[in-house]
Protein backbone atom coordinates (compact mmCIF):
# COMPACT_ATOMS: atom_id res chain seq x y z
CA UNK A 1 0.00 0.00 0.00
CA UNK A 2 1.27 3.48 -0.86
CA UNK A 3 1.81 5.95 1.93
CA UNK A 4 0.31 9.41 2.16
CA UNK A 5 3.78 10.88 1.64
CA UNK A 6 4.27 8.84 -1.55
CA UNK A 7 0.90 9.95 -2.90
CA UNK A 8 1.60 13.57 -2.01
CA UNK A 9 5.04 13.43 -3.66
CA UNK A 10 3.60 11.86 -6.82
CA UNK A 11 0.91 14.54 -7.05
CA UNK A 12 3.43 17.32 -6.43
CA UNK A 13 5.65 16.01 -9.23
CA UNK A 14 2.73 15.74 -11.66
CA UNK A 15 1.03 18.99 -10.65
CA UNK A 16 2.77 21.28 -13.21
CA UNK A 17 1.78 18.98 -16.07
CA UNK A 18 -1.76 18.58 -14.74
CA UNK A 19 -2.11 22.36 -14.38
CA UNK A 20 -0.97 22.78 -17.99
CA UNK A 21 -3.64 20.33 -19.20
CA UNK A 22 -6.54 21.29 -16.94
CA UNK A 23 -7.72 24.57 -15.34
CA UNK A 24 -6.57 23.48 -11.86
CA UNK A 25 -6.25 26.08 -9.11
CA UNK A 26 -5.43 23.65 -6.28
CA UNK A 27 -5.31 19.97 -5.32
CA UNK A 28 -5.69 18.55 -1.83
CA UNK A 29 -5.87 15.11 -0.27
CA UNK A 30 -8.59 14.43 2.27
CA UNK A 31 -10.25 11.41 3.81
CA UNK A 32 -8.55 8.27 5.09
CA UNK A 33 -5.16 8.89 3.45
CA UNK A 34 -5.03 12.43 4.82
CA UNK A 35 -5.96 11.19 8.30
CA UNK A 36 -3.46 8.31 8.21
CA UNK A 37 -6.28 5.76 8.43
CA UNK A 38 -6.07 4.24 4.94
CA UNK A 39 -6.38 0.50 4.42
CA UNK A 40 -5.75 -1.71 1.38
CA UNK A 41 -9.36 -1.05 0.32
CA UNK A 42 -9.16 2.75 0.62
CA UNK A 43 -9.51 5.02 -2.35
CA UNK A 44 -7.66 8.33 -2.60
CA UNK A 45 -9.94 11.29 -1.98
CA UNK A 46 -8.78 14.39 -3.86
CA UNK A 47 -10.42 17.80 -3.70
CA UNK A 48 -9.73 19.94 -6.76
CA UNK A 49 -10.50 23.60 -7.25
CA UNK A 50 -10.67 24.88 -10.81
CA UNK A 51 -9.96 28.35 -12.14
CA UNK A 52 -12.06 27.83 -15.25
CA UNK A 53 -14.58 25.55 -16.87
CA UNK A 54 -13.70 21.85 -16.81
CA UNK A 55 -16.74 20.09 -18.33
CA UNK A 56 -16.14 16.52 -19.47
CA UNK A 57 -12.40 16.87 -18.81
CA UNK A 58 -13.27 16.24 -15.15
CA UNK A 59 -13.65 12.54 -15.97
CA UNK A 60 -10.43 12.52 -17.95
CA UNK A 61 -8.61 14.11 -15.01
CA UNK A 62 -10.02 11.50 -12.63
CA UNK A 63 -8.83 8.69 -14.93
CA UNK A 64 -5.40 10.30 -15.29
CA UNK A 65 -5.03 10.57 -11.51
CA UNK A 66 -5.98 6.90 -11.07
CA UNK A 67 -3.38 5.87 -13.63
CA UNK A 68 -0.77 8.13 -12.06
CA UNK A 69 -1.35 6.85 -8.53
CA UNK A 70 -2.23 3.25 -9.36
CA UNK A 71 -5.17 3.53 -6.97
CA UNK A 72 -8.90 4.24 -7.16
CA UNK A 73 -9.46 8.00 -6.93
CA UNK A 74 -12.55 9.79 -5.69
CA UNK A 75 -12.18 13.22 -7.32
CA UNK A 76 -14.34 15.96 -5.84
CA UNK A 77 -14.77 19.49 -7.16
CA UNK A 78 -14.60 22.22 -4.51
CA UNK A 79 -17.64 23.91 -6.06
CA UNK A 80 -19.56 20.65 -5.82
CA UNK A 81 -19.12 20.31 -2.06
CA UNK A 82 -21.98 21.64 0.05
CA UNK A 83 -20.86 23.96 2.86
CA UNK A 84 -21.93 21.54 5.62
CA UNK A 85 -19.80 18.76 4.09
CA UNK A 86 -16.86 21.07 3.43
CA UNK A 87 -16.73 21.89 7.15
CA UNK A 88 -16.27 18.17 7.80
CA UNK A 89 -13.47 17.59 5.27
CA UNK A 90 -11.72 20.95 5.66
CA UNK A 91 -9.78 19.80 8.73
CA UNK A 92 -8.33 16.84 6.77
CA UNK A 93 -7.10 18.78 3.73
CA UNK A 94 -3.46 18.32 2.75
CA UNK A 95 -2.70 20.65 -0.15
CA UNK A 96 -0.13 19.52 -2.71
List each model region and its residues.
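Conserved histidines in hydrophobic membrane contexts and catalytic metal-binding motifs
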Residues: 29
Amino acid sequence: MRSTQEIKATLQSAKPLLMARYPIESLALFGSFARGEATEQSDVDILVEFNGSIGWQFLTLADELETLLGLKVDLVSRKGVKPRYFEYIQKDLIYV
